């Protein structure tokens, strides 16, 4: 990284970031390999062993150097002169190189900013992604209205590149990036379809994540600027990491650019109790006040996306609901605020009267229907939730079959221990338990009852329900830990964010 820093310091002295030559350096792709991002694309063909192949990278760089291979050929659609004959393999290597190179200047900006004393002092105000959980616990019980917003994708990837051009001044680098995306994503179309973006994001996760995070960071910077300016109380400034990428110079830039444009509209948005939470492509906007101000923010988001980022968003896709009547989905959970009503008898002198007390409680519920749908898709049960056998696993040993089912149960228990009601989680465990028994019975060509009677596997299969309690009994003191407390309390594990299949809200 010191070599990159010296290189970029020379570029800054010329008021420009020259990233283009770095694309043709072999150590860039070695850096991508060492960071373990999409490691499988650098493997040799079958028979050469699982070793990093510099030969493929050298051949690719040679083709990129040649002048005739950088000419866009509209007539030859089957053969790609830029990516060669192995389009998928080469495109993944190039995307890794682009992602590494474009992250370097921003990483150095972030490192230099963290070395400053004022930024280090503000560490206590840095908001982590894990702060979502205490936020849901502490704040949502005092809020009344919530808006569930799906952040729209840009209609064309050119928008993402244009946003990035404001911060990186290197025309040759962006010409090469456009050329790569033109061949891979069919930029000759007027509108990039969602299917094409999805395919590109799966094949080039790091590059797409960087471009998409930059787009989200841009609009959130404007939103946070307005949010801080529109509060009745002066908020203490803080810095936010938006999924690894945040640039501190943006704050001063926003004050200069947007202060004049929004100086007359800020009184319309004054709401000190508005809260904003985002994870991946979904955000939650919640407020304590009347829905009128929520509608103002809703139209603000729509106009910001349409006018500033050229992203089309329908107003009907953003709904404003009461927390006590509707639930919202975030991080794989269904959440709402439940009203608990209780009556208290009070006596004053000779008069006795009842006082009704209404308290709020946050309910975080396991999404049972989507989970059953996922289990049915994986052939553990039918669409009604009735367990079925898994014949594909019948060739494995009994121990391996039981261990596979237990691993799934562990992951589900680990993820959904933050739920306030465990009944749905136990139902999922019950489906997996019976599916495991039926799979073992199918392997031994026997009925479920005869298999259990012959093998005595009932005690072994009880691990589906007892293993989590045993683990927690080792964490908490035995005198304070009880089974009733385990059923009642929520336990958040901070590593659940790595379970992408469960976190994904789509």
Curated annotation (Swiss-Prot):
GO molecular function: RNA binding
Cell location: Plastid, Chloroplast
Keywords in alphabetical order: Chloroplast, mRNA processing, Plastid, RNA-binding, tRNA processing
Gene Ontology biological process terms from the UniProt entry: mRNA processing; RNA splicing; tRNA processing
Pfam family, one: MatK_N
Any GO CC annotation of this UniProt entry: chloroplast
Main subcellular location of this protein, as a coarse class: plastid
Database matches in InterPro entries: Domain_X (IPR024937), Maturase_MatK (IPR002866), Maturase_MatK_N (IPR024942)
HAMAP family: MatK
Family assignment from sequence similarity: Belongs to the intron maturase 2 family. MatK subfamily.
Function: Usually encoded in the trnK tRNA gene intron. Probably assists in splicing its own and other chloroplast group II introns.
UniProt name for this protein: Maturase K
Organism of origin: Trifolium lupinaster
Gene field: matK
């Amino acid at each position: 990284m010191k070599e990159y820093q010296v290189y970029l310091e020379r570029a800054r002295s010329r008021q420009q970031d020259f990233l283009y030559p770095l694309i043709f350096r072999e150590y860039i792709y070695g850096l991508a390999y060492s960071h373990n991002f999409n490691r499988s694309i650098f493997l040799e063909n079958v028979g050469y062993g699982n070793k990093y192949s510099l030969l493929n990278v050298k051949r690719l760089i040679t083709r990129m150097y040649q002048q005739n291979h950088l000419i866009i050929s509209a007539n030859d659609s089957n053969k790609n002169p830029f990516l060669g004959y192995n389009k998928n393999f080469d495109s993944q290597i190039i995307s890794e190189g682009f992602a590494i190179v474009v992250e370097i200047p921003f990483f150095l900006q972030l490192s230099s900013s963290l070395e400053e004393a004022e930024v280090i002092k503000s560490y206590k105000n840095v908001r982590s992604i894990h702060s979502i959980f205490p936020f849901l616990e502490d704040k949502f019980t005092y809020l009344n209205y919530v808006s569930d917003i799906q952040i729209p994708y840009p209609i064309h990837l050119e928008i993402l590149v244009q946003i990035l051009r404001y911060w990186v001044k290197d025309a040759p680098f962006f010409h090469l990036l456009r050329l790569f995306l033109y061949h891979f994503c069919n930029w000759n179309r007027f509108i990039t379809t969602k299917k094409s973006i999805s395919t590109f994001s799966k094949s080039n996760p790091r590059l797409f994540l960087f471009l998409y995070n930059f787009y989200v960071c841009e609009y959130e910077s404007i939103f946070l600027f307005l949010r801080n300016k529109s509060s009745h109380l002066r908020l203490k400034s803080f810095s936010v990491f938006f999924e690894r990428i945040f640039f501190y110079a943006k704050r001063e830039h926003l004050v200069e650019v947007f202060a004049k444009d929004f100086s007359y509209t800020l009184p319309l948005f004054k709401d000190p109790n508005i809260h904003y939470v985002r994870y991946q492509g979904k955000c939650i906007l919640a407020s304590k006040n009347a829905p009128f101000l929520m509608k103002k923010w809703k139209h603000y988001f729509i106009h910001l996306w349409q006018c500033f980022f050229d992203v089309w968003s329908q107003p009907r896709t953003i709904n404003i609901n009461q927390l006590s009547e509707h639930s919202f989905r975030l991080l794989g959970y269904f959440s709402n605020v439940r009203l608990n009503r209780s009556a208290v008898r009070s006596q004053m002198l000779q008069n006795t009267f009842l006082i009704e007390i209404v308290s709020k409680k946050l309910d975080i519920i396991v999404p049972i229907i989507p989970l059953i749908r996922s289990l049915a898709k994986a052939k553990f049960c039918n669409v009604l939730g009735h367990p079925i056998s898994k014949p594909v696993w019948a060739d494995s040993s009994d121990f391996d079959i039981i261990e596979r089912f237990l691993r799934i149960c562990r992951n589900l228990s680990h993820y959904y221990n933050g739920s306030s009601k465990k009944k749905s989680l136990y139902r999922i465990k019950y489906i997996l338990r019976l599916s495991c028994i039926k799979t073992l019975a199918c392997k031994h060509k026997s009925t479920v009852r005869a298999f259990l009677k012959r093998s005595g596997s009932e005690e072994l299969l009880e691990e589906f329900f007892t293993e989590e309690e045993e683990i927690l009994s080792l964490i908490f003191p035995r005198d304070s830990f009880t089974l009733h407390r385990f059923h009642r309390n929520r336990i958040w594990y901070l590593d659940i964010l790595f379970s992408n299949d469960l976190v994904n809200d789509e």
